[in-house]
């Protein structure tokens, strides 16, 4: 701030403060934080988990250098009707999830709430199918309730 355009002198404190306040709005991270844009864009609206209905099962190709089809599901959230893609973690976990099932999703745990690993654009993972934990279903400790 000690450039040629900055006010100098004994009583320049207030002017420097106002100039710094105005300059902060040129930084995108400050703008996002001040206007809470991350919360507005979040499909879960700041909640740690969300319930939704499975619309379809999808297989996503892993990013290079890996070669795999990651099993995911498209979920429509009950609270606001938004659609998100959620990863089905575990071996053959996709077999326990059917269309029109109610699932609970949570963040996948990527950096800054973004995608994790080689799954492109997937920020969420399935935690519960109906009332059963997906981990317990995969391990065979629980059975999915037939309606």
Swiss-Prot record:
Keyword presence, Ribosomal protein: yes
Signal sequence extent: none
GO cellular component, one term: small ribosomal subunit
Annotated PROSITE patterns: RIBOSOMAL_S12 (PS00055)
GO-annotated molecular function: rRNA binding; structural constituent of ribosome
A biological process from GO: translation
Pfam families linked to this entry: Ribosom_S12_S23 (PF00164)
Similarity field: Belongs to the universal ribosomal protein uS12 family.
Assembly mode: Part of the 30S ribosomal subunit.
PANTHER family: 30S RIBOSOMAL PROTEIN S12 FAMILY MEMBER
Entry function: With S4 and S5 plays an important role in translational accuracy. Located at the interface of the 30S and 50S subunits.
UniProt protein name: Small ribosomal subunit protein uS12
Organism: Methanococcus maripaludis (strain DSM 14266 / JCM 13030 / NBRC 101832 / S2 / LL)
């Amino acid at each position: 701030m000690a450039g040629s355009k900055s006010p100098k002198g004994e009583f320049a404190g207030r002017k420097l403060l106002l100039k710094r306040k105005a300059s902060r709005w040129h930084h995108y991270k400050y703008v996002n934080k001040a206007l809470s844009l991350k919360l507005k864009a979040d499909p879960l609206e700041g909640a740690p988990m969300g319930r939704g209905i499975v619309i379809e099962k999808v297989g996503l190709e892993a990013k290079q250098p890996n070669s795999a089809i990651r099993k995911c599901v498209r979920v429509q959230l009950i609270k606001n009707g938004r659609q998100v893609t959620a990863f089905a973690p575990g071996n053959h976990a996709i077999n326990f999830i059917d269309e029109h099932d109610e699932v609970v999703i949570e963040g996948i745990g990527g950096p800054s709430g973004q995608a994790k690993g080689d799954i492109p654009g997937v920020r969420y993972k399935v935690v519960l199918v109906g009332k059963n934990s997906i981990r317990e279903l995969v391990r065979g400790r629980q059975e999915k309730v037939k309606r």
